[in-house]
């Protein structure tokens, strides 16, 4: 009875849907268009629900008939199967499906099973938390906590996964808010992360953030308002809230909860131990942390050639790959016959803003012992010669020079000469300042003359427009025009006088300097 009522209701709903679609195609009143569209959507949903209910009822009847046929004797089995087939075909016709051959149905079922298994595997890996590598733009390798969003293949066919980083420390690592919904319009040109494809072999176990180990003064990574995690230091802890001060001077101090703070990616370099065992443990931890170690000057010189390039295990290793393609064998020297150098070339830091010629000159000066001693050696004999000189005998010409120049009798001729040189330098500097001031005055006066000429041009145009119209306005314009012309004449005279002063100064310079 329930099956018949559902079938009748389904028939009624389909008839109503056809009427609504006919009304929409007929072009009804625009005010009723929205209501009809909503009614069509509701009827479609109602038909889908009724079909699913009818399908479940018929499945239950089919299962009950199968259970009943199992208890029947064996000779009557073909008749039971045929009746079941008839019911199944009637059921498929009722829901509007076409019957398929048995082989096709088996193939479809096996294909659907395989696809379901693949989907289950993808669903199993999706959402998994791991520790994934991240190669920064400056070439360093860091491991960050991440979440798997799907499985993909790398370019070389190797199995990989796409991950999104949970604690982004750069804008390029921050997940795009529209990527997971499939609404991002920028695709590869988006400035945010759409996930990074990582090989399965490069993944590491997820490391849970131990916030309990943080104390006042501990370094940490803190989440800013822009969603990026920046390096910071804890300054205060009070009732579950952490006050942090960011290392960047551009970011202000913030009060955050525990879920907005994590320990740094690698431990602080300041926390070290005096024991040798602790040092070895720290070295092992540094090797396992995924960061390249910086060797000191002493250790770099004693590094064995077989260990050279070992840091490339934590990077893409493009240098070693290029050398291997060119035929280089690890541990041997460079060159065709492996007779070249094995150790790396030491970098030489040159001063900024200096050319190679200047750097070579500086190195040669250092080797020669410097230039200052050479200059001092030159000055010494001159100073001794001046100090050891004897006072020349006075004559009548010295007496006349003293009286005419106003020089005291005890002053030496060399001292008067130096005083005259100082006075000449002061006069020369004063003349340079006065010349600069004259040049500035000439430029300002020329600019004022141009402004006054433009003003006279505007007044002449206004006067030409008002000819024969208003005598009062014309008289005012004529007065302003005559005043502007007088000011222009005065400015031109001032410019001529300044130019004369400039020429006089230039002539004086030519006459006094040889």
UniProtKB/Swiss-Prot annotation:
* Primary location: nucleus
Query: Where is the G-patch domain positioned along the sequence?
Result: 315-373
Q: Which organism is it from?
A: Xenopus tropicalis (Western clawed frog)
What does it do? Transcription repressor that specifically binds the 5'-GGAG[GA]A[GA]A-3' consensus sequence. Represses transcription by recruiting the chromatin multiprotein complex NuRD to target promoters. Negatively regulates expression of EGFR, a gene involved in cell proliferation, survival and migration.
Instruction: From the Swiss-Prot or TrEMBL record, state where the protein is found.
Output: Nucleus
Q: Which SMART domains does the entry link to?
A: G_patch, ZnF_C3H1
- Zinc-finger: present as a keyword of the record? yes
The name under which this protein is listed is Zinc finger CCCH-type with G patch domain-containing protein
PANTHER family the UniProt entry points to: ZINC FINGER CCCH-TYPE WITH G PATCH DOMAIN-CONTAINING PROTEIN (PTHR46297:SF1)
């Amino acid at each position: 009875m329930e099956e018949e009522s559902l079938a009748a209701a389904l028939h009624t709903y389909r008839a109503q849907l056809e009427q609504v679609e006919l009304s929409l195609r007929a072009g009804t009143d625009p005010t009723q268009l929205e209501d009809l569209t909503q009614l069509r959507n509701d009827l479609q949903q109602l038909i889908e629900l009724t079909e699913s209910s009818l399908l479940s009822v018929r499945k239950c009847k089919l299962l009950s008939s199968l259970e009943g046929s199992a208890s029947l004797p064996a000779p009557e089995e073909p008749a039971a199967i045929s009746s079941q087939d008839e019911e199944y075909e009637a059921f498929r016709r009722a829901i509007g499906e076409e019957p398929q051959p048995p082989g096709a149905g088996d193939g479809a079922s096996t294909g659907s099973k395989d696809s379901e298994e693949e989907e289950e595997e993808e669903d199993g890996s999706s959402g998994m938390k791991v520790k994934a590598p991240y190669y920064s733009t400056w070439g360093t390798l860091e491991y960050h906590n991440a979440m798997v969003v799907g499985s993909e293949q790398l370019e070389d066919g190797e199995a990989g996964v796409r991950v999104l980083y949970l604690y982004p420390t750069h804008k390029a690592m921050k997940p795009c808010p529209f990527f997971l919904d499939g609404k991002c319009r920028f695709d590869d040109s988006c400035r945010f992360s759409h996930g990074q494809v990582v090989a399965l072999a490069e993944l590491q176990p997820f490391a849970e953030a131990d916030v309990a180990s943080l104390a006042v003064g501990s370094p940490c990574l803190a989440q800013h308002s822009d969603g990026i995690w920046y390096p910071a230091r804890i300054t205060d802890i009070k009732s579950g809230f952490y006050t942090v001060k960011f290392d960047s001077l551009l970011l202000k101090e913030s009060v955050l909860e525990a879920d907005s703070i994590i320990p740094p990616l690698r431990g602080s370099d300041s926390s070290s131990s005096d024991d040798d065992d602790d040092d070895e443990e720290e070295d092992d931890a540094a090797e396992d942390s995924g960061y390249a170690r910086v060797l000191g000057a002493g250790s770099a010189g004693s590094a064995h050639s077989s260990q050279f390039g070992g840091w490339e295990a934590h990077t893409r290793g493009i240098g070693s790959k290029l050398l291997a393609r060119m035929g280089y064998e690890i541990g041997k020297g460079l060159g065709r016959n492996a007779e070249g150098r094995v150790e790396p070339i030491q970098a030489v830091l040159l001063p900024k803003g200096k050319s190679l010629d200047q750097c070579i000159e500086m190195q040669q000066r250092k080797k020669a012992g410097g230039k200052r001693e050479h200059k001092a050696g030159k000055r010494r004999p001159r100073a001794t010669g001046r100090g050891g000189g004897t006072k020349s005998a006075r004559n009548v010409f010295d007496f006349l020079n003293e009286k005419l120049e106003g020089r005291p009798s005890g002053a030496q001729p060399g001292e008067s000469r130096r005083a005259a040189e100082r006075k000449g330098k002061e006069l020369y500097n004063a003349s340079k300042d006065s010349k600069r001031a004259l040049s500035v005055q000439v430029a300002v006066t020329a600019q004022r003359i141009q402004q006054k000429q433009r003003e006279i041009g505007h007044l002449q145009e206004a006067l030409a427009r008002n000819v024969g119209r208003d005598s009062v306005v014309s008289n005012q314009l004529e007065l302003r025009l005559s005043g502007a012309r007088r000011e222009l004449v005065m400015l031109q005279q001032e410019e001529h006088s300044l130019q004369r002063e400039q020429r006089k100064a230039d002539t004086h310079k030519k006459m006094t300097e040889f």
